[in-house]
Amino acid sequence: MRLAMPSGNQEPRRDPELKRKAWLAVFLGSALFWVVVALLIWKVWG
């Protein structure tokens, strides 16, 4: 799967605010996933 990266000069009607919220959501989702994984491992070996 190839991701087409838009070049800087042709930014299609995208908020920097929206992009920041998207990155924040990705970061929080990833952090939540790893917390759940750590808790499962802790319960298995606890």
Curated annotation (Swiss-Prot):
Subcellular compartments: Cell inner membrane
Superkingdom in the source lineage: Bacteria
GO cellular component term, pick one: plasma membrane
Transmembrane segments: 22-42
Main location: membrane
Keywords: Cell inner membrane, Cell membrane, Membrane, Transmembrane, Transmembrane helix
Induction conditions: Constitutively expressed (at protein level).
Membrane topology: Single-pass membrane protein
Xref: NCBIfam families: YmiA (NF000536)
Name the UniProt record assigns to this protein: Protein YmiA
Lineage: Bacteria, Pseudomonadati, Pseudomonadota, Gammaproteobacteria, Enterobacterales
